[in-house]
From Swiss-Prot:
Organism listed in the record: Clostridium beijerinckii (strain ATCC 51743 / NCIMB 8052)
Single GO MF annotation: S-adenosylmethionine:tRNA ribosyltransferase-isomerase activity
Main localization (coarse): cytoplasm
Subunit structure comment from the entry: Monomer.
Protein name per the record: S-adenosylmethionine:tRNA ribosyltransferase-isomerase
Record-stated family: Belongs to the QueA family.
Cited function: Transfers and isomerizes the ribose moiety from AdoMet to the 7-aminomethyl group of 7-deazaguanine (preQ1-tRNA) to give epoxyqueuosine (oQ-tRNA).
GO CC terms: cytoplasm
Keyword entries, A-Z: Cytoplasm, Queuosine biosynthesis, S-adenosyl-L-methionine, Transferase
PANTHER family (UniProt xref): S-ADENOSYLMETHIONINE:TRNA RIBOSYLTRANSFERASE-ISOMERASE (PTHR30307:SF0)
Pathway: tRNA modification; tRNA-queuosine biosynthesis
Length: 341
């Protein structure tokens, strides 16, 4: 298949620049993957589509304030580091801007010296391995000095950091939010539990590769970035019991989906596991674990719209996206949601 098969017209004004005041007041498009039928709802109505005994799978990763803006020791020249992933205790793989300043051996300082950094390696892809020096706990230092790494298509400043976190975020490590989960409130999750639906958590730390465009024409040639995931025995057991009963496993977001499909065996069962995944799900792939999906509206030609098209059918998805544009749905991270049933 060709990348162009997943292109669609999107007016720029439909790209949501800020979250809605009430998380679950966003719109919800319900798409029947068998018939292609579309219904327009509010996100809170999702509960109507979840049945007793079903299991909802959420990604509890937490976005780090991973943008650090500082200066070069000696000259005061400006530098920006974006932390991508931890290599070992105080060494991180980072994007550096401007790259020419971040040579091996160069030292930088942040927050009037509260945090210092030295570039120890330049990788083939241009990323830097950076060692950090500080007093206390790194996460606390980062929390006080770092900024949220918002996606490149969001141009407005985020007033409240917590609006780019899910209400159940727990495990620090992401460079971007698992945005399908942003629509849930604590009250809605409690209502879902009260209806007899299981809620389980896994962790996948979202990397910046999620925003990288597909640069090859043929999907078969695209290589995904690797991301760290973790599924507990408790969550795995509940998912397996759900499959045995014939109930639905409903994945919240493409990140939860990619984790479940990485771990799942040919019978759709999962086990306690952690590791790195670079699974790329595109049409032709047969889902093993995930039956239904809650997701946002994605970028044209992105790996995310390809995953969604694999579950619901490309034609159904492209029709649904055309209708979403006509109905002026809000797109991308702070936008509206879709439920594929």
């Amino acid at each position: 298949m060709n990348v162009k098969d997943f292109d669609f017209y999107l007016p720029e004004e439909l790209i949501a620049q800020h979250p809605l005041e009430q998380r679950d007041s966003s719109r919800l498009m319900v798409l029947d993957k068998k018939t292609g039928e579309i219904k327009h709802k509010k996100f809170h109505d999702i509960i109507e589509y979840l049945n007793e005994g079903d299991t909802l799978v959420l990604n509890n990763t937490r976005v780090m304030p991973a943008r650090l803006i500082g200066e070069k020791e000696g000259t005061g020249g400006k530098i920006e580091f974006l932390l991508l992933k931890r290599i070992e205790k105080d060494r991180w793989e980072c994007l550096a801007k401007p790259g020419k300043s971040a040579k091996v051996g160069r030292k930088f300082t942040f927050g009037e010296g509260k945090l210092k950094a030295e570039v120890v390696e330049v990788e083939e892809n241009g990323n830097r391995i950076v060692e950090f020096f500080y007093d206390g706990i790194f996460e606390e230092v980062l929390d006080s000095l770092g900024e949220m790494p918002l996606p490149p298509y969001i141009h407005e400043r985020l007033e409240d950091r917590e609006r780019y976190q899910t209400v159940y975020s727990k495990e620090n490590g992401s460079a971007a939010a698992p945005t399908a989960g942003l629509h849930f409130t604590k009250e809605l999750l409690q209502e879902i539990k009260n209806k007899g639906i299981n809620i389980v958590y896994l962790t996948l730390h979202v990397g910046l590769g999620t925003f990288r465009p597909v640069k090859v024409e043929s999907l078969e040639e695209h290589e995904m970035h690797s991301e760290f995931y973790m599924l507990s025995k408790e969550s795995a057991d509940i998912i397996n019991e759900t499959k045995k009963r014939g109930n639905a496993v409903i994945s919240v977001g493409t990140t939860s989906t990619r984790t479940l499909e990485t771990i799942g065996d040919e019978n759709g069962f999962v086990k306690e596991q952690s590791g790195w995944t670079n699974i790329f799900i595109y049409p032709g792939y047969k889902f093993k674990v995930v039956d239904k999906l809650i997701t946002n509206f994605h970028l044209p030609e992105s790996t995310l719209i390809m995953l969604v098209s694999t579950l619901a059918g490309r034609e159904n998805v492209m029709n649904a996206y055309e209708e979403a544009v006509n109905e002026k749905y809000r797109f991308f991270s702070f936008g509206d949601a879709m439920f594929i049933k």
